[in-house]
């Protein structure tokens, strides 16, 4: 079973049912699946290939849920970044994971000024917020709006879906792998 199977099953069983409701934005499972599919397609358009790492630095929201499903849908590996990390730790997680794309919300956009020159593998930064993205970032909504739907990539249940970092109590944080 792949992570995308959860969304596909929800659309089959209750497509018109509520999938998410956050700060006045509501969507049913059919709408949610459409956005997840198009975000996955948009990530592929940025060059994300199976196994590529896509990091997420944002607070919980309906959009976080979208990219939690869209990254493995695209064949990528999601790397959630702890929102309480200091800039040097964020740099370590991004570089150690080899993240090529970073999805970042308004709450953390300012931290990029402190870390930008230290990121080794990052190619694209996607602003997940309302309004125009800061300079040098792509718009999350434009990425979705400009992409066509796509079927989930058949990566197989034993393929890597996520990379979660430990607390680092015995040294630097280490990535722990989660398969589909």
PLM feature spans:
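A short N-terminal helical cap/helix-turn-helix that marks the beginning
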Residues: 1-18
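Structural core segment of the AMP-binding/adenylate-forming
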Residues: 8-9, 45-46, 73-142
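Conserved pre-ATP/AMP-binding loop-to-beta segment of ANL
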Residues: 15-16, 147-165, 172
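Conserved AMP-binding/adenylate-forming core of the ANL superfamily
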Residues: 18-61, 65-69, 86-91, 139-142
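Conserved AMP-binding A3 loop
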Residues: 28-30, 161-180
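Surface-exposed loop/turn positions
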Residues: 52, 76, 158-159
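Conserved S/T- and glycine-rich ATP-binding loop of Class I adenylate-forming
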Residues: 54, 71, 102, 160, ...
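Short, conserved catalytic or interaction motifs in soluble domains
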Residues: 59, 83, 178
